[in-house]
From Swiss-Prot:
Belongs to the GAB family. The gene is Gab3. This is GRB2-associated-binding protein 3. Phosphorylated on tyrosine residue(s) after macrophage colony-stimulating factor (M-CSF) receptor stimulation. Highly expressed in spleen and thymus and weakly in brain, heart, lung, kidney, uterus, and embryonic stem cells. Also expressed in myeloid and macrophage cell lines. GO terms for cellular component: cytosol. It comes from Mus musculus (Mouse). The keyword Kinase does not apply.
Length: 595
């Protein structure tokens, strides 16, 4: 947020949360009060660790808050009870803030309450006092546009009794006028439209944006039943109303009230149109000293609270013709036409009435062209003949009947050529549509060709590999496989070539050791072992699966071994092996028997 939104800043001592007021320390922080009303940001109270900190410690939202001076001990610590303490209470937390002096506390309380819209009375009185001493061209903000037109709601009669009641009503409304805030809250505003019995009033804007608004905010509206040259009554409106009033350039004047029932329909000023829709519901108070009301004024009605009408539809124009006597308020012998009028007229807007009067004819022609472009029913005939431009070779008339001058309507100032309201020409029966080459479509996507699965390799199932290991035992030895040193767990594994080589080397080493080392075993009767022969077969099946069918099977590389690591395998004679084992067992039995 910019520094221009800063309202007040200074050092304050901040309280901890309410449940920790007595236990936790009160910190001295740099507080900044920011108003975000003009920039669209919320009104906040920020506090920083010091002056030069860029990021605030906390941002307190003042959208729903109350502020007041602290009275009494309450929850305040003893060291701060005699100081200048004020309280800011929000929806989430209550802050006890300690100021250094009473003047600082007054400034903070007044600034926060002003931001939180708690000082409407003082602000309204100050704004009214400053408004009476400042000219209309030096008003500081568009907030003063809130003090625009104020119209009495009671009826004005000719006798003095009712006149006094009107003055009393105006005095009461003047007292209500002091309570208005500096700025207009748009959510409280209402837009309305004058009905046929209401009196249009000319608002005198008192803000410095009046001049620019009067020139740029002329909202064009289609109005039926208006006099083509109604601006003649706008140039000298005061001669018919018998209202004597000057137009000073410095002092802002009240609104000029137009009479609704002044002699003759030609003197009915601006009452023949629902004119001057004001975007603000509050209006300027009419002071009796500044404006002398005409004797023919019967009543002043406040604007209706009905929303603005929707844009007209084609059926709206025919219905408007029937309601024309209601809108105009009097019957006119002249042929009704279409004209354009601004929604609001101010003092600066009257300077442009002359140019606006000259543009009525061209604007009416432009609206006729717009109606033709929308194929709306035309209420008038083309009064102004236009010269038809030279027809181009590529120009195709929209209607088969009529000449080129009738087919080409009047061109407006912005070179807009509307369409003709006539029907389109009929096409010949033998006319065929142009051929369409669908292969030239830019976003057409061809289907991808089907996958060619002929070159893809399939999963080849290999036959199971069966390896049979036979572990024979001598009938005379009756040895268990544990005593023979055969590890059965190795038989169930799936060794590779290197592991098989290592296992065979280890088995040979174990066999050599078992010939030397003599183990002691308990004696078992030879009769019980003679009937046992231990022979088992172990079948191991291997199935090679290749799950990646597209890629070839990986080639297993054999490790190259040196001459020292290479082992030459020989076929083992089973008879010699059994003889060695039986000899070993006999030696063992003899040693055990000697012990």
């Amino acid at each position: 947020m910019s520094t221009g939104d800063t309202v007040c800043m200074g050092w304050l001592i901040k309280s901890p949360p309410e449940r920790k007021l007595q236990r936790y320390a009160w910190r001295k922080r740099w507080f900044v009060l920011r108003r975000g009303r003009m920039s669209g940001n919320p009104d906040v109270l920020e506090y920083y660790r010091n002056k030069h900190s860029n990021k605030p410690i906390r941002v307190i939202d003042l959208s729903e808050c109350t502020v007041w001076k602290h009275a009494g001990p309450g929850f305040i610590r003893k060291e701060f009870q005699k100081n200048f303490v004020f309280i800011v209470k929000t929806t989430s937390r209550t802050f006890y803030l300690v100021a250094k002096t009473e003047e600082e506390m007054q400034v903070w309380v007044h600034s926060i309450s002003q931001v939180c819209n708690f000082s409407h009375l003082e602000d309204g009185a100050d704004s009214m006092e400053s408004l009476s001493h400042m000219p209309s061209s030096f008003q500081p903000s568009p907030a003063s546009s809130l003090h625009t037109v104020h119209v009495a709601n009671s009826a004005l009669l000719k006798d003095d009794r009712n006149t006094n009641s009107v003055v009393t009503e105006e005095t009461r409304r003047e007292s209500e006028f002091l309570f208005l805030p500096d700025y207009l809250i748009l959510s409280n505003c209402e837009t309305g439209r004058l009905h046929h019995a209401s009196l249009p009033t000319r608002c005198d804007s008192w803000s410095n944006s009046n001049h620019s608004l009067a020139q740029t905010s002329f909202d064009d509206v289609f109005l039926d039943g208006l006099q083509p040259f109604i601006s003649n009554n706008l140039v000298h409106p005061l001669h018919h109303g018998k209202v004597s009033q000057d137009f000073p350039s410095i002092r802002p004047q009240a609104s000029l009230i137009w009479n609704r029932e002044i002699n003759g329909p030609s003197r009915n000023l601006m009452s023949s149109s629902p004119l001057l829709e004001s975007s603000l519901n509050p209006t300027v108070h009419v002071e009796e000293k500044q404006v002398s009301l005409p004797s023919g004024v019967k009543e002043l009605n406040i604007m209706s609270n009905t929303p603005p009408p929707r844009p007209p539809k084609p059926s709206y124009l025919s219905e408007q013709r029937q309601d024309q006597p209601l809108l105009t308020g009097h019957s006119s012998n002249k042929k009704p036409g279409y004209t354009m009028v601004p929604r609001r007229i101010s003092l600066s807007g009257l300077d442009h009435v002359g140019s606006w009067k000259g543009d009525v004819q061209s604007q009416s022609l432009r609206h006729r062209d717009k109606r033709l472009s929308l194929n709306l029913p035309c209420k008038f005939s083309p009064i102004y003949p236009t010269a038809s431009p030279s027809a181009e070779d590529s120009y195709v008339p929209m209607s088969p009947k009529g000449t080129a001058s009738e087919l080409r309507p009047h061109c407006s100032q912005d070179d807009y050529i509307p369409m003709s309201s006539s029907m389109l020409p009929e096409l010949p029966a033998d006319l065929e549509p142009p051929p369409v080459n669908r292969n030239l479509k830019p976003q057409r996507k061809s289907r991808p060709p089907p996958l060619d699965s002929r070159n893809l390799s399939t999963i080849q199932e290999h036959t199971s590999l069966t390896r049979t290991y036979t572990v024979p035992c001598n009938r005379t030895s009756f040895l268990s496989p544990q005593r023979n040193g055969i590890n059965c767990a190795r038989l169930f594994s799936t060794p590779s070539e290197e592991e098989e080589e290592e296992e065979e080397e280890e088995e040979e080493e174990e066999e050599e050791e078992k010939y030397i080392q003599m183990e002691e075993y308990g004696t078992v009767s030879s009769l019980s072992r003679s009937a046992l022969s231990w022979t088992k077969k172990f079948s191991l099946d291997y199935l090679a699966l290749d799950f990646n069918s597209t890629s070839p099977a990986p080639v297993q590389k054999k490790l190259l071994l040196s001459e020292e690591q290479r082992v030459d395998y020989v076929q083992v004679d089973e008879q010699k092996t059994q003889a060695l084992r039986s000899t070993k067992q006999e030696w063992t039995d003899e040693r055990q028997s000697k012990v």
